[in-house]
Amino acid sequence: MKTLLRTLLYLALIVWLGAEIFFPVVAAVTFTTLQPQTHIAGTIVGQLLRILHGMGLVSGMVALALLALGPAWGLYKPRSVLAPMALVIFMMAATVYSQFGIIPAMERDRMAAGGAIDTSDPTNPNTIDFNRLHNRSEHVELTILLMGLATVVLVARAESGKS
C-alpha cells in the first residue's frame, strides 16, 4: 500500500512537471508551423496553457493530499513533508495567478490592441502591456517548474515514517 501511495504522489508530480517541460516545446513547434498566422498559433497555445494549468491544479491537489496524509499512513515523518507541501501550495498559487490573473489581462490587452498583437503598433500601450505580461507568464511558468523540481528532490529525500 505504501508503494502505491508513493507511486501516486510521484505520478502527480511527474504529470505536472512533464507538462511544464513539454509545453514550451509544443509552443515552439506551433509557432514555427503556423509562422504566418501567429494569431492562430497564439490562440492554440493559450488553450494549451489553460489545459496545462488545469492539469497542474489537479496534480497539485492530489500531491498535496498525499503529502498531508503521508505521515498518518506511515509514508513520511511529519516534518519531512512540510517543505514539499509548502512548495506545492506555492506552485498551485502561481498557477492560479497565471490562469486567472495574467491570461485574462493578456487577452484584454490583445483585444484592446486590435486582436492580433503581432500586427499592432509596438508603441501601443496595450501591446506593451501584453508583452510585459507575456514575459511575466514565462517567468511564472519557469518558477513553477523549478519549485516542482525542488519538490521532487525534497520528497525523494523525505524520511520514511515507521512501518
Language-model regions, residue ranges each:
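Interfacial loop at the N-terminal end of multi-pass membrane proteins
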Residues: K2-L82, E107-N131
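Hydrophobic alpha-helical membrane-insertion segments
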Residues: I14-L17, L87-I103
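Transmembrane alpha-helix boundary/anchor motif
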Residues: V25-V26, Y97, G101, A150
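Helix-loop junctions at the membrane-solvent interface of multi-pass transporters
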Residues: Q35, L69, S98-G101, L154-R157
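Selective detector of the "anchor" transmembrane alpha-helix that sits immediately C-terminal
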Residues: M61-L64, E141-S160
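Cytoplasmic juxtamembrane regions at transmembrane-helix boundaries
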Residues: G70-I89, V155-S163
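Individual transmembrane alpha-helix segments
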Residues: R132-V140
